[in-house]
């Protein structure tokens, strides 16, 4: 059975490296869409210090059309086995579909990074059947383009969601050590909603491990004025280090090397 607690015990704060096998992801679409480029990217992520590799075949970025389940599986069936074969660290699959999750686990993936934003019995059964890790993401609005009114307490809303998801998972017979919590920065939230989540990791991290995925996102561009997402890696690394110092257990990033450098500075303060 996969355990986030055991992985963190040996490594401390974890860096999850992003590997998108999509032509349309918001900052790196089309970069890893062949066997050779996938192997090169896996090796790069591992050499740079990734603790987990998160594979996505269906972009949920704003303004992108969600592909069919058939297309998502088609992208994965010839590339995912290559990724698992060449990875010396756990691999997660970024999907909201239980059939895709089951396929990925059959191919050797260890973690489901679930962006659905709702407890689903089919997904829960897949997680239970394979003893997989399960990351819950708070979705905000009905999709990545919408936002709802949190009445000034987005952190409270996210924590309530985490509590509900945790209870349902435990009631279903899934171990607490299999669970991870992602507050969903940039999903169904305004920039004003995203800001307090970054600043309130101390409260949010009462659900552990807390995952923060702020890499290259619009909030980084808003703060820094950097328009091109690919130019936001240094600022993203600073944000990741701040969230870890405030209690985040996992940071999901595009540039692992720069993030590891930032975390090494934080570790000197005795945080990690």
Task: Outline where the language-model segments fall.
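Active-site-adjacent loop and "lid" segments of alpha/beta metabolic enzymes
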Residues: 2-6, 10, 27-41, 60-82, ...
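Structural preference for beta-strand elements that scaffold enzyme active sites
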Residues: 14-18, 51-54, 90-92, 110-111, ...
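Short polar catalytic/cofactor-binding loops
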Residues: 20-24
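Catalytic domains of carbohydrate-active enzymes, especially glycoside hydrolases
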Residues: 40-56, 246
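Active-site loop-to-helix "anion-binding N-cap" substructures in soluble metabolic enzymes
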Residues: 45, 50-52, 90, 95, ...
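Phosphate/pyrophosphate-binding loops at sites that engage ATP/ADP/AMP, CoA/4′-phosphopantetheine
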Residues: 46-50, 163-178
């Amino acid at each position: 059975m996969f355990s986030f607690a055991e992985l963190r015990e040996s490594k401390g704060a974890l860096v999850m490296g992003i590997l998108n096998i999509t032509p349309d992801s918001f900052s790196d679409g089309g970069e890893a869409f062949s066997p050779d480029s996938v192997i090169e990217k896996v090796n790069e992520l591992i050499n740079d210090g990734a603790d987990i590799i998160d594979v996505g075949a269906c972009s949920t970025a704003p303004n992108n059309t969600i592909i069919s389940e058939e297309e998502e599986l088609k992208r994965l069936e010839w590339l995912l086995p290559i990724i698992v074969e060449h990875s010396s660290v756990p691999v997660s699959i970024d999907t909201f579909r239980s059939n895709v999750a089951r396929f990925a686990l059959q191919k050797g993936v260890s973690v489901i990074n679930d962006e659905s934003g709702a407890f689903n019995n089919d997904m829960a059964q897949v997680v239970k059947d394979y003893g997989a890790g399960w990351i819950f993401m708070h979705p905000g609005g009905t999709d990545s383009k919408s936002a709802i009114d949190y009445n000034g307490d987005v952190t409270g809303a996210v924590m309530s969601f985490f509590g509900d998801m945790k209870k349902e998972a435990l009631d279903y017979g899934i171990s607490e050590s299999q669970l991870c919590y992602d507050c969903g920065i940039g999903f169904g939230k305004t920039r004003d909603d995203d800001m307090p989540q970054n600043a309130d990791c101390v409260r949010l991290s009462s659900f552990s491990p807390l995952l923060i995925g702020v890499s290259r996102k619009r909030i980084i561009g808003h703060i820094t004025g950097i328009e091109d997402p690919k130019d936001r890696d240094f600022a993203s690394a600073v944000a990741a280090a701040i969230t870890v110092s405030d209690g985040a257990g996992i940071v999901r990033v595009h540039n692992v090397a720069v993030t590891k450098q930032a975390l090494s500075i934080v570790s000197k303060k005795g945080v990690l």
